[in-house]
Amino acid sequence: MPSATPEIKQRVDQLRSQLQKASYAYYVLDNPIMEDVVYDQLYRELQNIETQYPELITPDSPTQRVGDKLSEQFISVNHNIPLYSLENAFNLQEFARWQERWQRLTPDVTQFEYVCELKIDGSAIALTYENGLLVRGVTRGDGIVGEEITPNIKTIRSIPLKLALDNPPVRIEVRGEAFLPIEEFERINQEKQTAGESLFANPRNAAAGTLRQLDPRIVDRRRLQFFAYTLYVIDSPSTPTTQWESLEDLQQMGFLVNPNRKLCQSEAEVDQYYQLWDTERHNLPYMTDGVVVKLNDYQLQQQLGFTQKFPRWAIALKYPAEEAPTQVKNITVNVGRTGAVTPMAIMEPVQLAGTTVQKATLHNSDRVAQLDIRVGDTVIIRKAGEIIPEVVRVIEELRPPNTQPYQMPTQCPECHSTLVRPKGEAVTRCVNSSCPAILRGSLVHWCSRDALDIRGLGEKVVILLIDNGLVHSIADLYHLKVEQIASLERMGTKSANNLINAINKSKQQPWSRVLYGLGIRYVGSVTAKLLSDNFKSVEQLSQASFTSLESVYGIGAEIAQSVYDWFKIEANQTLIKNLQQAELQFETLSETPKYPPISSTPLAGKTVVITGTLPSLKRNEAQELIEKAGGKVTNSVSSKTDYLLVGEDAGSKLTKAQQLGISQLSEEQLLKMINPQE
């Protein structure tokens, strides 16, 4: 094989530099400088050159972020510097007592500063860089020994593979928090629910579980983020002298550092910061459960040192978790559209995080056995991550006499078929494809917002259609008549006409949405888009081999096998034929663009936040329009926000935008910006 010419080597350096700058701008600065299609083109060019000339591959190349599967176990390694946990304070009085303790140890210190940072609800990791290159990533573990997960760490785009320094220190260690943004957490749980799998209870568990995946490709698909918060410069005379300086140095090196930090001069300022974020944290795109307060001066930190468990110079000032006791009235099971049978605790209603909670998932029979939860038990429930209600524990001391352990049913409560628990799975399933619950779930999923988006066809109407024998499969929806629907309870001619129009309108939904609507196990909306981009028609996808499916970037073996198997089932082939006859879209159509080229729109490269209820557009529709026009939609208002799209009942985002002087748009103004001709 011929060696690479100087021109090829120069091109490789150029490509890496362009891709690294684009990645930094996108993931760290939140300010894209390159369109996705351009990034993908440059990435593929670099990948092709490295395939042809493997001697040019370097550890910091953008192509090396996602590697092959890890070995079947992680290697335990000692931390160079112990990764201590923090002492907790649950109110400002406990914080004041902590301050009194450290001041007694340093009576000569009269002037000091605190650095306040939000405590991110994720997993702590330690990164080692040598001569500017990432060489190791380790979990916290017990603080002394962690597990090396470097291939997984490399998939996190906000962690630089190479420091953005001309003359990097010989060796540094960076500590920080790997976490899942709320939107990504919800997307992952939606896909797990689609697949009939147990859901993650909260973003922290999801982040920890993701980091310990043996396949880096799965980690890459889950889009972890990373905030750096500690810097140790080893083997170098030039070291920062304060925590604040360290955070600024980390930013210079290319790390994402939480912008919501503050340098405080007094306990009163810490109090203000704590109270502010107790309210504002609900508007953040990630979960935070408190504030980390550190003494700023490193010399003072060194003077105070550590206890056996904690540093004396830092404390976690946490917000109280919302937990409450309630009584279990019943334990039932739900049968999902994939046949997954999920036990649910039905409880006396209780208020948590501003909502009334009376149901909590128990996930599967293993979790039921672990809790030993019984009807009549008093339990502690928590709005986990303020997202999913979960049963934390059973208070056995309050258990009534003569209660019986709960037994999972052996027959489906809907169709009475024998339930099975497939080998290697935690979930019990109904495998009867004619089960009414599976049909009901399939129809509701098909009509859902991210699938065919058939307005007016929710679960209640679906149940009416099934109970009256009008539909036996998804394809039957497209043969319904106005008079059939009008005869149903509480429908009438007007509602029936609206529903038929909505069903007919769904025939124009693109191939990616149709694919998602089919409900193939493990295929969520994002995966469906990946597949439809690579297989332009149902014929291409149904004839694809397992190998060609798995070779698609972002598609792992589990998804590939599920898709491959689904298209081999005769009933599914019949469903596809029937839907094709109903004129659904089973291929990617080339359309004349409705909107001007991205580069010519006023929204190109702009960041937009949406708040309130818009007059006609749904939030996901507005987001799609903005992104088609070259803009980017984020969840929270910051100094980087260009526009706030405002609807009715706008919340605190509007107040913050006004304080920052950010331009506001109405829906009408947005549509004129996107397409001035309309």
Curated annotation (Swiss-Prot):
Binding-site positions, NAD(+): D36, V37, V38, Y39, D40, S85, L86, E117, R140, E177, K294, K318
One MF term in the entry's GO annotations: metal ion binding
Binding site for Zn(2+): C412, C415, C430, C435
Any one of the GO CC terms: cytosol
InterPro entries with a match to the protein in the record: BRCT_dom (IPR001357), BRCT_dom_sf (IPR036420), DisA/LigA_HHH (IPR041663), DNA_ligase (IPR001679), DNA_ligase_AS (IPR018239), DNAligase_adenylation (IPR013839), DNAligase_N (IPR013840), Hlx-hairpin-Hlx_DNA-bd_motif (IPR003583)
Catalytic activity: NAD(+) + (deoxyribonucleotide)n-3'-hydroxyl + 5'-phospho-(deoxyribonucleotide)m = (deoxyribonucleotide)n+m + AMP + beta-nicotinamide D-nucleotide
Lineage top rank: taxon: Bacteria
Enzyme class: ligase
Disulphide bridges: none
Sequence ranges assigned to domain BRCT in this UniProt record: 598-678
GO biological process, one term: DNA replication
CDD domains, A to Z: BRCT_DNA_ligase_like (cd17748), LIGANc (cd00114)
Active site: K119 (n6-amp-lysine intermediate)
Enzyme Commission designation: 6.5.1.2
Keyword tags: DNA damage, DNA repair, DNA replication, Ligase, Magnesium, Manganese, Metal-binding, NAD, Zinc
Role of this protein: DNA ligase that catalyzes the formation of phosphodiester linkages between 5'-phosphoryl and 3'-hydroxyl groups in double-stranded DNA using NAD as a coenzyme and as the energy source for the reaction. It is essential for DNA replication and repair of damaged DNA.
Protein family: Belongs to the NAD-dependent DNA ligase family. LigA subfamily.
HAMAP family: DNA_ligase_A
NCBIfam families: dnlj, PRK07956.1
Protein name according to UniProt: DNA ligase
Organism listed in the record: Gloeothece citriformis (strain PCC 7424) (Cyanothece sp. (strain PCC 7424))
